[in-house]
Amino acid sequence: MTMVIGLTGGIGSGKTTVANLFGDYGIDIIDADIIAREVVEPNTTGLNAIVDKLGADILLTDGTLDRSKLRNAIFNQQQLKDWLNGLLHPLIREKMLSNISKATSPYCLLVVPLMVENNLQTMTHRLLVVDVDESVQIDRTQARDNVAPEHVKKILMAQASRQNRNAAADDIISNNGNSAELKNKVAELHQKYIKMSHLY
């Protein structure tokens, strides 16, 4: 069995950057965001169920899911949101487990933005948290998504607090510094995980 390192962090913390640095070492990356898109591709159980529930006008002309329409449909509709989560979460989990079983690197990285919030660290052997100051999160997310600081603060309020996330971590990587520092930290953790991977 491959050792699974869970990777998480708040919005704008640099999870993707950190994951890509591990990927440079040939480590298999399993990304929950990518899987969440895959389980609603055309002709999947997920998309078929959404169409059955909400009708064909939830699709774009090319037959793919109209994500903004879906977002609007579930906005302030808690029952519908719960139904959607009940449909998609098991599909995402099943695909994550399937991808983990196919991993060939000494350990693999399971990247889940809301890992602590959804208690998905139970799927991992260790949890690595990318930690960053809130002011940095706001600046980065504003620059990346072109949104107002208030919008970013709302997202931060909906996520686990920095303290809760860090308390759940086995390893914490700070991403307030420069890219050279981050590369060095990833290199150290990679060596540590390679040594630990022999235990699994």
UniProtKB/Swiss-Prot annotation:
Pathway: Cofactor biosynthesis; coenzyme A biosynthesis; CoA from (R)-pantothenate: step 5/5. It is an enzyme of class 2 (transferase). Its EC number is 2.7.1.24. It is found in: Cytoplasm. Gene3D superfamilies: P-loop containing nucleotide triphosphate hydrolases. Catalyzes the phosphorylation of the 3'-hydroxyl group of dephosphocoenzyme A to form coenzyme A. ATP binds at G12, S13, G14, K15, T16, T17. It comes from Photobacterium profundum (strain SS9). Belongs to the CoaE family. Residues 4-200 form the DPCK domain. Its main location: cytoplasm. It catalyses: 3'-dephospho-CoA + ATP = ADP + CoA + H(+). One of its GO terms (biological process) is coenzyme A biosynthetic process. The gene is coaE. PROSITE patterns: DPCK (PS51219). This is Dephospho-CoA kinase. GO terms for cellular component: cytoplasm. InterPro entries: Depp_CoAkinase (IPR001977), P-loop_NTPase (IPR027417). GO terms for molecular function: ATP binding; dephospho-CoA kinase activity. Keywords: ATP-binding, Coenzyme A biosynthesis, Cytoplasm, Kinase, Nucleotide-binding, Transferase.
